[in-house]
């Protein structure tokens, strides 16, 4: 399942990869927040079921998940990049997966910059020590477990962290699958400046700051 908002310039590759593994991916759900570009036509062209509603990643993921009553749900971002062999790695994870747990991937930026590797290591530390994977690492979760947790939190920002906290440390585990993601924001803002801003937002959220206020700051 993929939340989208004007992602026509990059979502095609991800949809093509998923649609190319029909024995593994039974259904693709795109939950759109009001795209004005060709996102929806691209999604439908790849056979995706489209859900529409107000923008906001938490709400979009929540609406999309409500369309899936059973089975495993793989939450992805529109800029996620699946590496060669991803289908086999996902199949191996599913073969031994516990429906009472959720699984996250290993972050990899689409950049050869050495600073990208440092930020990736910091993300790995966050997952190992805090068990707080971000949405750009993807999350594989069973529909029944997600429903038992009252679905994806309807937040403008930090819905991934809020869901991870609902799951708790014991119900989160890594999977042996690299998830590529765009480095555009880090290249624009500066690798360490962006990483520091993300850390500050995380700490503010954990301290109880309103996610809507954090989302406004995030867009600046």
Give the label of every model feature segment:
Residues 157-163:
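Acidic donor-binding loop at a coil-to-helix junction in glycosyltransferase catalytic cores
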Residues 52-68:
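Glycine-rich, basic loop-to-helix element that forms the pyrophosphate-binding segment
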Residues 84-115:
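Conserved donor NDP-sugar-binding/catalytic core segment of glycosyltransferases
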Residues 165-220:
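Hydrophobic helical membrane-anchoring modules
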Residues 9-13, 37-46:
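Acidic helix N-cap motif at the loop->helix transition within catalytic regions
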Residues 32-40, 80:
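A conserved acidic beta->alpha catalytic loop
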Residues 16-25:
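Short, acidic, metal-binding catalytic loop of nucleotide-sugar glycosyltransferases
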Residues 73:
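Short aromatic/hydrophobic "clamp" motif used to bind/position activated sugar donors
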